[in-house]
Each structure stands twice: as structure tokens, then as C-alpha cells.
Amino acid sequence: WGRRLVEEGYVALCVDMFGNATQAESLEHGLRLFGEVTQDRELWQRRARRVFDAFRARPETQGCEIAAIGFCFGGSSALHLACTGAQLAGAVCLHGDIPRISGEEAKAISASLLVCNGAADPVVPNEQALTLAQDLKGSGVDWQMLLLGETGHSFTNPDAARAGSR
């Protein structure tokens, strides 16, 4: 996706949040990797913010609006980054775990938020979407959510379900 964004004329940064170019070999392996990183919310947010600040300091990003876009763990990371007060134009979470957002965090969000999840996702319960709606109610945050019917996890990657079943 990063190459595709660059081809469209954007400056892009792809972040390896697991480290060492690790890719999940199955859904179970992916969930284990996800759990290892996400156990400490403050650490997760600090890491995301550190990457953002380094990216923002690059000459090619000066004067540009920046959005954080991610799939699954990356989507969750985009929402966590928005909660740090990073000056983002937008944060997009595609089939990602949806974090709780406190009132203090909501006050720090400058980004417009877009969350897109599958209604039949076995990994991200629909209750998370409802909870996010409650967390952001009356907060002043510009947010939209799409819950796609009869759609499972990793809907942006049709091969993911096949890879996870091997």
C-alpha cells in the first residue's frame, strides 16, 4: 500500500510495528504478535508518536497534511496516534481493533477519524464500534464509522483468510 500511495503522489511511511519484518503466518500467530505489542497502551502510543514525530521532521513532509492509515494492527495504531494529539488531518482504521478513547484523549484529537470494520469479523467484536460511538459522543471529534454487512476480518486482503487457514 505504501508504494501505491507514493505512485499516487503522496509521501508515505510504512511502519513495522512488530519489528524485524515479521509477518503473521496465521490468524492465531497474528493475534499473538498483536497481543505482545498492545499489552502496554502508553508504550504503544509513545512508539506511534515517536514514529510520527520523526516522519513529520522530514523535509518532504513540511507544509503537508498527514494522515495515518492502517490495516488491522496498523489501523488500531492510527487511532492510538490520533489520541496522542499528533497533528493529523485524518486517521483511518481498516478492520482494526477499536480502542476505548477517554475524554482526555478525545480532547487531544485533531484528526477526522474513519473506522471501517466487518460486521461478521470474529476478531473485532461489533461492541467495540458501539463503545467508540459512546466514547466520542459529544466530544467534538469528527468521526465516521462503516460497519460492513456479512464481512469478516482482513476484508481488504482476500488472501488473508486463505493464508490463515493453512
Predicted regions and their residues:
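Serine-hydrolase catalytic machinery in alpha/beta-hydrolase-like enzymes
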Residues: W1-T61, T156-S165
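Alpha/beta-hydrolase-fold catalytic nucleophile elbow
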Residues: D16, I69-F71, V92-H95, C116, ...
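Short alpha-helix in the alpha/beta-hydrolase fold that links the catalytic acid
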Residues: P125-D135
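Primarily recognizes the serine-hydrolase "nucleophile elbow" in alpha/beta-hydrolase
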Residues: A48-S110
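C-terminal catalytic histidine-bearing segment of alpha/beta-hydrolase fold enzymes
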Residues: K137-R166
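Acidic beta-to-alpha connecting loop that harbors the catalytic carboxylate
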Residues: A119-P122, E150-G152
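Short beta-strand/loop motif that positions the catalytic acidic residue
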Residues: I109, V115-N117, D121
